[in-house]
A protein has these predicted regions:
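Outer-membrane beta-barrel pore domains
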Residues: 1-139
Length: 139
């Protein structure tokens, strides 16, 4: 389910998702499990006659959780059965004509995660920070 509000210079979108995996021992799902999550995405676009023409500042806040327990044989749908996570991402973007450059900064935190199934070289770190730089041509 998605809803978008658009009133320049703002675009705000929210969504909710739900998934379900039924019990199926043939694939190792000895208990049914599901995920549910949601996000809010907000984007501010600077006007062409502003001091920052071509600049957009998107921000995304997300949450997802899974149900079930490892003891009952639930499948791992996230960071272990019954785990959850939230994240925030900022993606400043500049576009000139058909050329763009975009940076992305993201932070995620896992909650009620199973040790060894999360982040880092041993899978035991409950948080992760990432950065990325992208540039390209739109066609």
């Amino acid at each position: 389910m998605i809803y978008t509000y658009n009133a320049a210079p703002w675009t705000i979108t929210s969504y909710f998702q739900y998934t379900r995996v039924p019990q199926d021992p043939a694939i190792g799902a000895f208990q049914s499990a599901s995920t549910y999550g949601g996000a809010i995405l907000a984007n501010y676009s600077f006007a062409d006659d502003s001091r920052l023409p071509g600049v957009r500042l998107p921000v995304r806040l997300e949450y997802i959780a899974s149900t079930g327990s490892a003891d009952a044989g639930a499948p791992n749908l996230l960071y272990g059965p019954g785990s959850a996570a939230w994240s925030i991402t900022v993606t400043p973007t500049y576009q000139y004509d058909k050329y763009f450059v975009r940076a992305e900064f993201s932070y995620v935190e896992a909650l009620q995660a199973t040790p060894g199934l999360v982040f880092g070289p041993t899978g035991n770190s409950m948080t992760q920070t990432r950065g990325m730089l992208e540039f390209g041509i739109l066609f």
